[in-house]
């Protein structure tokens, strides 16, 4: 695997919100910083995430900002239809690469 193919994964909690925002931001920052700047993908697995509130959206936006600053990519994997809709109506969908293992 070359440096350009570096991928790290992070499982999002069932509820991504006020209580979990700091933890996921810290974990994401650690993973992003562990990859060479200018390369790598951080995959946030949303398979088991059922609820995202405004604090959770804010955490995702901050993670995305960290990645952009480091020229890295954030992938949201397996978001539910509700989370996809939330990302769409808040105009955040296009900030992320969204993947489904079911595609």
Task: Indicate where each model-derived feature is located.
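STAS-like cytosolic regulatory interaction modules
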Residues: 1-51, 62-103
